[in-house]
């Protein structure tokens, strides 16, 4: 049994090697499907679970008895029913809370507090800022925070690619800082990995809890629309890659050129909004059922009591003439108070935001703020 990372990478059996690299992860893999069902409002159970929230069965035609003259028997035709869809209102509550938290965390771009001591350091700082700008770090930071809060984990991988156009704009200004003779032909780039992007992440920790390698399993789509499972491992010096189709096939490993592991990894044991999921489920059920009540009871019905003797007036203003004892006509209106429903909805919304320490930034909430 291999004892360290070097021994694992030296194993001749690729399948065994990958299995050991996966065991370097100390936590359970996030349940991507379950997380996606909570994140995507189109996948909420109020929308997809037709057993728990069935459509309404409505009588379309009553049963009737029919006499068959040929046989002299009477047959009963069964009643016919039709399925009427019920209201299904989903609320993207998790998305709203996570987006607000992301905006308050990195909505304002983090500033680098750095005071260069000489001209070379100033030029080096300009180069670092240019790298961040070309990689759109301002926007990638938001994606990272959003993924970390909703998907439990995210990783940012930095790598080098051939591209001399990056240095064309400011090479004259910084060439003395970088030696001054040969213009670099490489460019720093970064990419985000997370469960919703189809990645299974396997950070490899040693006994001291230090991440000494990082692996990623993903599917690559080929030109013929077939998919190949790929596994890559990054260490402090090298990048190893394997493809799995009929069997494992190893690609040529290469040195990434950095003095340390070029991966930033963030993990949390549960999604940020797990504690308020029951609130969201109750809200969706409450609003959907209330919408059905409004559809069926909002418009008043005319109740006629007595014998209809005739009609008077024109078609537009026609009146019904009722006779008999207790003859009357009145509208049936829905007199149920909706205060309890309103109170529960407002309470659940307020608790969902307060328990996640998330400010409500709607116009109504902010209108009274000083």
Kindly give the residue locations of the regions a language model identified.
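A structural detector for beta-sheet-dominated domains
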Residues: 21, 36, 49, 78, ...
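Generic low-complexity segments that are intrinsically disordered, proline-rich and/or Lys/Arg-biased
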Residues: 55, 86, 93, 111, ...
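Solvent-exposed, flexible loop/coil residues
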Residues: 116, 141, 153, 200, ...
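Charged, low-complexity, helix-prone segments enriched in Lys/Glu/Asp/Gln
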Residues: 19-43, 47-49, 137-150, 230, ...
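Extended, regular secondary-structure scaffolds
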Residues: 142-268
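Extended, helix-rich architectural segments
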Residues: 1-188
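Extended, charged amphipathic alpha-helical segments
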Residues: 247-370
């Amino acid at each position: 049994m291999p004892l360290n990372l070097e021994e694992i990478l030296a194993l001749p059996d690729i399948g065994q090697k990958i299995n050991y690299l996966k065991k370097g992860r100390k936590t359970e893999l996030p349940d991507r499907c379950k997380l996606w069902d909570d994140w995507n409002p189109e996948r909420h159970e109020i929308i997809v679970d037709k057993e728990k929230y069935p459509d309404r069965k409505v009588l379309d035609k009553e049963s009737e008895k029919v006499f068959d003259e040929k046989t002299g028997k009477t047959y009963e035709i069964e009643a016919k029913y039709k399925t009427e869809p019920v209201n299904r209102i989903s609320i993207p509550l998790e998305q709203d809370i996570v987006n607000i938290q992301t905006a308050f965390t990195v909505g304002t771009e983090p500033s680098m507090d750095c005071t260069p001591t000489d001209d070379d350091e100033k030029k080096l700082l300009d180069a670092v800022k240019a790298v961040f700008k070309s990689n759109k770090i301002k926007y990638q930071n938001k994606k990272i925070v959003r993924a970390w809060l909703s998907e439990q984990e995210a990783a940012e991988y930095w790598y080098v690619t051939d591209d001399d156009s990056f240095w064309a704009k400011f090479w004259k200004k910084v060439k003395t800082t970088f030696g001054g003779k040969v213009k670099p032909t490489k460019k720093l780039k970064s990419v985000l990995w997370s469960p919703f992007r189809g990645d299974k992440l396997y950070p490899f920790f040693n006994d001291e809890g230090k991440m000494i390698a990082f692996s990623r399993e993903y599917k690559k789509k080929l030109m013929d629309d077939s998919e190949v499972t790929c596994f890559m491992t990054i260490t402090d010096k090298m990048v190893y890659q394997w493809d799995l189709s009929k069997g494992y096939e190893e690609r040529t490993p290469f040195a990434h050129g950095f003095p340390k592991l070029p991966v930033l990894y963030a993990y949390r044991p549960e999604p940020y909004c797990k504690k308020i999921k029951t609130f969201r489920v109750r809200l969706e059920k409450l609003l959907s059922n209330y919408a059905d009540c409004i559809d069926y009871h909002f418009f008043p019905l005319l109740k006629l009591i007595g014998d209809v003797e005739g009609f008077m007036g024109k078609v537009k203003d026609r009146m019904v003439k009722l006779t008999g004892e207790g003859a009357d006509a009145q509208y049936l209106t829905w007199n149920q108070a909706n205060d309890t429903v309103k109170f529960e909805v407002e309470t659940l919304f307020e608790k969902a935001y307060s328990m996640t320490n998330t400010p409500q930034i709607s116009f109504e909430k902010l209108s009274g703020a000083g």
